[in-house]
Amino acid sequence: MPKPPFFLSWIDLCGRLPQRRYLDRQDRPRRRYALFFSLLTLVLGFTYLLWLTPLVLQNREIPDFLFLAAEIVSFLLVGLMAVDVWHLRGHRPEGLSPDRQWPVDVFVPCCGEPLEVIKTTLSAVKRIAYQPREVYVLDDGASRQVAILAESLGFHYLSRPEAGLTLQDCKSGNLNFGLQHSRGELILVLDADQVPAPDILQKLVGFFNQDRVAYVQSRQAFFLPKGDPFYNADRVFYETMQLSNDLANAVVSCGSGVVYRRQTLEEMGGFATWNLVEDFTTSYEILSRGWRSIYFPYVLSRGLAPTDLVGVYRQRFQWCLDTMRLFFWDNPLWKRGLTWTQKRHFLIIMLSYLASGLAFPIFYAIPLLVYLRGYSFLQGYELPYGVLRLAYLAATILMFHFLFFQKEPLKQFKMLCSLFPVHALAIATALLHPPGRKPSYRVNNQLPFADQGRWWEVAPHLGFIALHLTLPLISLWQGWALPGLILFNSIFSAGIIWILGDLVLAVLEKPKWSPAMDPRQVYG
């Protein structure tokens, strides 16, 4: 029977947790600090909420209730991370040797991507050092050039339009079309822009020696400009959260660089078609049926990521929309077949979107209301509030530092805060699209080499920044609020400007590329 997280936490702090897994012993110092500050954050956060709640109930105004709700959502997210993310599972970089030569089908779904991108990917697929394998180019774009390219490389070419079929269910429908016309026991899925390493199958196939392993997801990586201004690398997720998910058997399929067992897919009727894209929902359904998932935390393929904010918005909107449709209409708390640990890990992802789209905008707006109204329910309680909130914040920062050690958690936090417009829209869209009413889908990376952004892409951010810069001065000049309250509130305004300013600067600055990472050179 699995031990509860806090029991494991206690025995690890006492130095009595067996160090059996790869890198467990080396990771122990980081893990113990992460545990300590996680527990401290839980205690301080709970104490802060216990102190804050009576003040809000005493005042009974809508903005104050919204502020309390935002604090509770944030605490729930932090709390789940504190409980479930401290222990990671590692794997040896050489992977596992297969006990036999599993027949593998490689699926490369396409839908109108530039020919040079598809050509680079297929040329790399040709160099994959594994047999037996069959490659299927699944072209929903029905491109004659792609067909000629696939045939010249000795690959199978399948196209739903040429077969007289509609493009129903987009990528998931395309993959299911390939599933019907292939027979390999394992299936490697690669997006049209994902350039695989020659040893990708050699390192992943061996994990299927183990019973009930349904899929193995390798770490995602991308060709990125210097500084990665939009944090497309997402090291917090790919280098920490997924390792924690691995330990909990809750690995999220990313839809590319992933190998599936055909038996699993056929058992559930193919790739999931309920959502916009198949990855998250397919893994969610597979795990609820009692199968196992594995995360291989090393880069075995590299692809394109959005280089302008419009592309980032479109991609993150789709991710958030799919996740929140599950939250509203197939919530993990009520999902049969998932363990409580798996439920918590899925809820972390869902709560991060709720915090970004709903809670954070409340934090941005509350100080502005104080400038306008000249009143705060915290008036007269500034000192205890400052002490409790700063202690809670400091513990949270230290917790994130050790949970996501050297993974740029501050950059990830700022990006999550800055994506509030698109996440709020995705949450609302998810509510309006129950089962049977699927949202529309648009393919990403059809124009992958975009450059500098435009100011209107960050209009909401510029609006908040402008208001936080001007309203304190206007409120002081007009006498709307007392100078002490304006000064106290200005601390929050400064923090909000600091958080949102990063994305504004990233959009207005032209990306700089190193030769090895420049997509124009990689993809010709």
What name fits each language-model region?
Residues 276-282:
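Acidic donor-binding loop at a coil-to-helix junction in glycosyltransferase catalytic cores
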Residues 121-132:
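Short, acidic, metal-binding catalytic loop of nucleotide-sugar glycosyltransferases
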Residues 1-100, 150, 356, 360-363, ...:
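N-terminal membrane-anchoring/stem segments of glycan-assembly enzymes
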Residues 139-147, 162-163:
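A conserved acidic beta->alpha catalytic loop
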Residues 283-301:
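Catalytic donor-sugar/metal-binding loop of nucleotide-sugar-dependent glycosyltransferases
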Residues 102-105, 134, 281:
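Cell-envelope/extracellular polymer assembly enzymes that use nucleotide-activated donors
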Residues 159-186, 198-276, 287-288, 309-351:
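Long helical/loop segments within the catalytic core of UDP-sugar-dependent glycosyltransferases
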